[in-house]
């Protein structure tokens, strides 16, 4: 098995005692952020629950700022997400917008990769973003001590050895961060490291 399960991600984030409303872990049928008054977040898979899932992405909504954040550890565009996973998030974005007093919000999304394609750690990176949103709601995508654990790499550089090394270091730093900050991760780190390991998906190295 490669990657983190729904249960593992829920338990990992439960160990962080989040102060905002973490809605949970969902497959691609996530309904959206339907309460226009409450800061909330979720981890959403690009696949269906029946398929076993494919790739985890972190989402968060800050109603005070009128912003929805989308943290994809690969930073893929909508077009690339469709090419790779046959998934679109238009429906839940639309439902979120319709619940807002003025029926609009700003989408802020990651555009660079922090994860190597050979890795199965998308869930751990997405969970790191959820903690970043919890602690630094005004700047969850960069510029705070949680999310700056990782460094973004432009897509055209992802398979260049020096930049691949950066992505590999991101994963090691993320393991270290979770070890330091989560009792759940410490108790289950052998299993979590094994299931999310670098080179778990070596065929994705080109």
UniProtKB/Swiss-Prot annotation:
Ways its activity is controlled: Requires DNA and protease cofactor for maximal activation. Inside nascent virions, becomes partially activated by binding to the viral DNA, allowing it to cleave the cofactor that binds to the protease and fully activates it. Actin, like the viral protease cofactor, seems to act as a cofactor in the cleavage of cytokeratin 18 and of actin itself.
Uppermost EC category: hydrolase
Subcellular location: Virion; Host nucleus
Keywords: Autocatalytic cleavage, Disulfide bond, DNA-binding, Host nucleus, Hydrolase, Late protein, Protease, Thiol protease, Virion
GO function term, MF aspect, one: DNA binding
Swiss-Prot/TrEMBL catalytic activity: Cleaves proteins of the adenovirus and its host cell at two consensus sites: -Yaa-Xaa-Gly-Gly-|-Xaa- and -Yaa-Xaa-Gly-Xaa-|-Gly- (in which Yaa is Met, Ile or Leu, and Xaa is any amino acid)
Gene Ontology, cellular component aspect: host cell nucleus; virion component
Principal subcellular localization: virion
EC number annotated for this UniProt entry: 3.4.22.39
Induction: Expressed in the late phase of the viral replicative cycle.
Name of one Pfam family that matches: Peptidase_C5
One GO BP annotation of this record: proteolysis
Catalytic site: 55, 72, 122
InterPro entries per the UniProt record, alphabetical: Papain-like_cys_pep_sf, Peptidase_C5
Lineage top rank: taxon: Viruses
Site (Cleavage): 52-53
Subunit: Interacts with protease cofactor pVI-C; this interaction is necessary for protease activation.
Function: Cleaves viral precursor proteins (pTP, pIIIa, pVI, pVII, pVIII, and pX) inside newly assembled particles giving rise to mature virions. Protease complexed to its cofactor slides along the viral DNA to specifically locate and cleave the viral precursors. Mature virions have a weakened organization compared to the unmature virions, thereby facilitating subsequent uncoating. Without maturation, the particle lacks infectivity and is unable to uncoat. Late in adenovirus infection, in the cytoplasm, may participate in the cytoskeleton destruction. Cleaves host cell cytoskeletal keratins K7 and K18.
Family: Belongs to the peptidase C5 family.
Further information: All late proteins expressed from the major late promoter are produced by alternative splicing and alternative polyadenylation of the same gene giving rise to non-overlapping ORFs. A leader sequence is present in the N-terminus of all these mRNAs and is recognized by the viral shutoff protein to provide expression although conventional translation via ribosome scanning from the cap has been shut off in the host cell.
Protein known as: Protease
Primary gene name: L3
